[in-house]
């Protein structure tokens, strides 16, 4: 039985992971649940899954949770970064689901990697920010890294074993691969009039046509920054060159991504848009377990369509692809700027189209610096956030 730590337990990925665990109770045990400040949600999860440890990033939330948990459950409640790192690196832990949204997930995820754990990577920002450092830490520790994002998981499933077992260091061309085709639905504004985008509200941006997700990733899907971050993540996971990676708009979200081979073959991974499928795949790889997802009904799907991305509609996608070509410093800046901009949009402080403008301004204006350590990455991230917050007044 695998002991699992779930980082981001109260989010959508956390909920899907717990659903898969519940469907396979003899194979997995919830060792620890980690969340930011959602006391009520965490209390409910603790009562249902009886973890050994419940960790709250927010100290006051930890105190509130401890006061409400029945003492008879004997659940240890912790808080603080040092305690979180000790938790994910504990000898009893086999697998870490890394599903904390944003830059906040980098430090604990990297700690789990350095400890040689089996890491199920749902936090794309970890690779967007730390890329080479993250991949090198995986190689040095012998950690097992498995991609949870539906697109990267789909790509992984379509690749030969010699690539799967050498993520970040593989040679796609040597394995006969010509292109990775990263699919995206285009989000809720794919066919909206360009002139109407500036007036789009957070509620509209969060209404994804196919996927059920949290607010931040939903807005990223509406701007297609999510696909841009996935482009950067794919570059590091699969060691791609720029011309080996392409974005394809696929509105139905049935094909989750594809791999094109030198001989003209294209292998695609398909399924209903439900995160329990890639989560179950990562949890059990190289075996297969029940996910609880209904099999794809091709007669109900009916039609599959594809188109090229429109960079006038999705400037954030263009910025991410450009930042990827510039290097690690640029992608770290872009990620930090985007987190500030999306947060401000969700709070009603800026308009939808201001997100891309703030991202572009930060990418052009924040001084880049060499990043040789995690401390350098965190410093550049913090510097960018300060600059991005100063920009908000310009667009308010």
Curated annotation (Swiss-Prot):
InterPro entries: DXP_reductoisomerase, DXP_reductoisomerase_C, DXP_reductoisomerase_N, DXPR_C, DXPR_C_sf, NAD(P)-bd_dom_sf. 1-deoxy-D-xylulose 5-phosphate binds at residues 124, 150-151, 185, 208, 221, 226-227, 230. Mn(2+) binds at residues 149, 151, 230. It is an enzyme of class 1 (oxidoreductase). NADPH binds at residues 10-13, 123, 125, 214. The keyword Manganese applies. Its EC number is 1.1.1.267. The keyword Metal-binding applies. Catalyzes the NADPH-dependent rearrangement and reduction of 1-deoxy-D-xylulose-5-phosphate (DXP) to 2-C-methyl-D-erythritol 4-phosphate (MEP). This is 1-deoxy-D-xylulose 5-phosphate reductoisomerase. The lineage of its organism: Bacteria, Pseudomonadati, Pseudomonadota, Gammaproteobacteria, Alteromonadales.
């Amino acid at each position: 039985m695998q002991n699992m730590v779930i980082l981001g337990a109260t989010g959508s990925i956390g909920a899907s992971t717990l659903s898969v665990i519940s469907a396979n109770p003899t194979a997995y045990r919830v060792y620890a649940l980690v969340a930011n400040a959602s006391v009520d949600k965490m209390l409910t999860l603790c009562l249902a899954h009886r973890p050994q440890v419940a960790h709250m990033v927010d100290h006051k939330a930890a105190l509130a949770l401890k006061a409400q948990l029945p003492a008879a459950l004997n659940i240890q409640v912790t808080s603080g970064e040092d305690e979180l790192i000790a938790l994910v690196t504990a000898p009893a832990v086999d697998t870490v689901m890394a599903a904390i949204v944003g830059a906040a997930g980098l430090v604990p995820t990297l700690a789990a990697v350095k400890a040689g754990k089996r890491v199920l990577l749902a936090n794309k920002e970890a690779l967007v920010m730390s890329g080479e450092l993250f991949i090198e830490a995986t190689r040095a520790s012998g950690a097992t890294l498995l991609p949870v994002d539906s697109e990267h998981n789909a790509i992984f499933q379509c690749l030969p074993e010699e690539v799967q077992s050498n993520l970040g260091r593989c040679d796609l061309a040597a394995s006969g691969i010509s292109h990775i085709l990263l699919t995206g639905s285009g989000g809720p504004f794919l066919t909206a009039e360009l002139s109407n985008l500036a007036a789009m509200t957070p509620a509209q941006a969060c209404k994804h046509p196919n996927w059920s997700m949290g607010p931040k990733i939903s807005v990223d899907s509406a701007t297609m920054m999510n696909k841009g971050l996935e482009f950067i993540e794919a570059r590091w996971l699969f060691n791609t060159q720029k011309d080996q990676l392409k974005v394809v708009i696929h509105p139905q979200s049935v094909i989750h991504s594809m791999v094109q081979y030198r001989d003209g073959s294209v292998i695609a991974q398909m399924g209903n848009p439900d995160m329990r499928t890639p989560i179950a795949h990562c949890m059990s790889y190289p075996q297969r377990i029940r996910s609880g997802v209904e099999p794809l009904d091709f007669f109900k799907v009916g039609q599959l369509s594809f188109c090229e991305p429109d960079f006038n509609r999705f400037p954030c996608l263009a910025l991410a692809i450009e930042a990827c070509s510039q290097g690690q410093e640029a992608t770290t800046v872009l990620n930090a700027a985007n987190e500030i901009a999306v947060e401000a949009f969700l709070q009603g402080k800026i308009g939808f189209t201001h997100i891309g403008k703030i991202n572009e301004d930060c990418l052009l204006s924040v001084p880049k610096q060499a990043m040789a350590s995690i401390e350098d990455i965190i410093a550049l991230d913090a510097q960018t956030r300060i600059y991005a917050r100063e920009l908000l007044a310009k667009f308010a």
